[in-house]
Amino acid sequence: MASALRQEGLTQEDYIEIQRRLGRDPNRAELGMFGVMWSEHCCYRNSRPLLRGFPTDGPRILVGPGENAGVVDLGEGHRLAFKIESHNHPSAVEPFQGAATGVGGILRDIFTMGARPIALLNALRFGPLDEPATQGLVEGVVAGISHYGNCVGVPTVGGEVAFDPAYRGNPLVNAMALGLMETDDIVKSGASGVGNPVVYVGSTTGRDGMGGASFASAELSADSLDDRPAVQVGDPFLEKGLIEACLEAFQSGDVVAAQDMGAAGLTCSCSEMAAKGNVGVELDLDRVPAREQGMTAYEFLLSESQERMLFVVQAGREEALMQRFRRWGLQAAVVGQVLEEPVVRVLQHGSVAAEVPARALAEDTPINQHTLISEPPEDIQEHWRWSETDLPSVSRDHDWGADLLALLDDPTIASKRWVYRQYDQQVLANTVVPAGGADAAVVRLRPQQGDASLRGANRGVAATVDCPNRWVALDPERGAMAAVAEAARNLSCVGAVPVAVTDNLNFPSPETPKGYWQLAMACRGLSEGCRVLGTPVTGGNVSLYNETRADDGSLQPIHPTPVVGMVGLVEDLGRVGGLAWRQAGDAVVLLGVSSDERQDDRVGLAGSSYQGVIHGLLTGRPPRVDLDLEQRVQALVRQAWEQGLLASAHDSSDGGLAVALAECSIASGLGVDGALPGDGVAPERRLFAEGGARIVVSVRAECMDAWTSLLADEAHAAVPVTILGAVADHGRFRLSLGSQPVLDQAVQTLTERFDQALPRRLGTA
């Protein structure tokens, strides 16, 4: 029995509770059902109490947490569905298929709501890129994402990629998707109508993906390579047909409820639909389209074969609906019915193979109780004692240009063109700002069907994914709050008003005091950031146990990584901007926190890229997040875009102000003549310190009078404004500290280092 419980990821206490709920011992199929549905991946048994603290209400929220995806009202008939999810463990053992099926799964969450997918983003984390093992993972994951997205015909428009030893052996692959509603009514997943048929559509069921949900809820080890059968195999061309057939079916009015079959397959779909509708579902496995012979009830119920959906259909309309799917070359079969008794009853070969109360699987699931320590762990407190004065002193003739080049060569900061050039960013012809051109992607709001498709298509949605994982490692609360702030800042830099959030909480085990403290503090910071910035959480994903067991038995946890996916509204696509300088003579201005004060705790080198790349350190307490100033700085930038005063906007984040300015020059090929304030402040702080509420803008030379008038507005009086210099056409990147020149590099030199960092390491330069 002990080995059977381990196989299902259950404890002895879980087994006793299962016996109590059933009033008997479970059979193998039932034990498997409980194993996947009581896993962290499906029921959030460690994180659910923390998630309840997230703000989830707002004037634009149509659907919040609990459905396949969140939905927000963007006005003028535009309703946007969006969601982020992880496929971390599968991608670690089978990078191509793990990443590809992660894309397929998040797309199904979107179109299951009745929305047509319009864009994809991803947030990726890997170990050091100089290591061959990491290079193989990167190549496989990027190829998998590219393959599925390109084939299914949905553009991948943005994302982020970071490299750190903490992710060695346990990469993070988070996929986000956006979709525009095409149905009048949002499709929900709660079953209703006793006697209504349950219809299976899509691909056939095989043995691939067996136990994927339980696999995703355990740490990785050297033996995990043997778990390749737990990784699903995707077919993007079949999914393309499934998208079209589902959207047609939803328009017909014949579908009562819909649920995609992702983690835990048929078990999850049946139990969630039944529990949400307070009804039951009877499932006959003999009717399920199978691709393999002799499959047991256990295998049918736990298979995670891809591109499958489960519908509850209006009685009498099932044949017409199935004909619709068959025209698209898809399987379709009536496999059960809605019951009044609130159970999931599974039949096979004329007998009951399993019968479990639906709520026991999908609603009334266990919660693991953890005690939150009252003080930060001792190692964190030790980190917080670090001071910038502990850094090695530098000589007066120190080569700051070499430091800047080293930062631009860091794979986390460097150009990700090697990644996004493999993605089709322009399919559907709605991508306005693609990856690499700005701090957020922008996609035109142009539905293919419905009244909204007939209106002018001059509105857009902006999207971004962000997480400063080095900050979160040192202070989870500040780091998670900074993730929300940076996401909103990135949207504001393209002129978008932040609307709502979907989150992906990637963490190590919560079963240690430090692990649970990290998770709890990050949730607190994320919640506060969303509350103050007015961006409610519409749903997301929790991925725990992201850690690798070494050969000596020790566990190597990842950095806690709460990825924030945020969407924003662009009212006028003619006022969207990027990060590149536009013309010589434009003023270069820093809005927000400057680096010219030693004691300002809103900016610093703790946890910075400079600290890591130049000194090999990760220590200190990250800067305090000033959410009030964030709001003010972002509002000023958005209004300046609206008035047509700006030529560019770019947030200062990884690498600090010097790197932000360099990225603007690299993107444009134009030079800059700039001077940073702060006499008496260490040069490294002025050049490379990081902090929130900092945006570099270039103001059109012909708009300086209007810019001055805007700054005089009382609403913007509290925003610090620092004139740094001007855009130049001499092709040099020149910065001085006061009157002392410290950087004078050819923009071409910066560009070559920035562009070649990934290709050189991957052998494709």
Curated annotation (Swiss-Prot):
One of the protein's GO biological processes: 'de novo' IMP biosynthetic process
Positions of Mg(2+) 1 binding: E85, N541
Reaction catalysis annotation: N(2)-formyl-N(1)-(5-phospho-beta-D-ribosyl)glycinamide + L-glutamine + ATP + H2O = 2-formamido-N(1)-(5-O-phospho-beta-D-ribosyl)acetamidine + L-glutamate + ADP + phosphate + H(+)
Residues annotated for Mg(2+) 2 binding in this entry: D109, D260
Alphabetized Pfam families for the sequence: AIRS (PF00586), AIRS_C (PF02769), FGAR-AT_linker (PF18072)
Residues binding substrate: S86, H87, N88, H89, R108, Q232, E304, S305, Q306, S543
Superkingdom of origin organism: Bacteria
Amino acids binding ATP: Y44, K83, D503, G540
Pathway annotation from the record: Purine metabolism; IMP biosynthesis via de novo pathway; 5-amino-1-(5-phospho-D-ribosyl)imidazole from N(2)-formyl-N(1)-(5-phospho-D-ribosyl)glycinamide: step 1/2
Gene behind the chain: purL
Name the record gives this protein: Phosphoribosylformylglycinamidine synthase subunit PurL
Subunit annotation: Monomer. Part of the FGAM synthase complex composed of 1 PurL, 1 PurQ and 2 PurS subunits.
NCBIfam families per the UniProt record, alphabetical: FGAM_synth_II (TIGR01736), PRK01213.1 (NF002290)
Top-level enzyme category: ligase
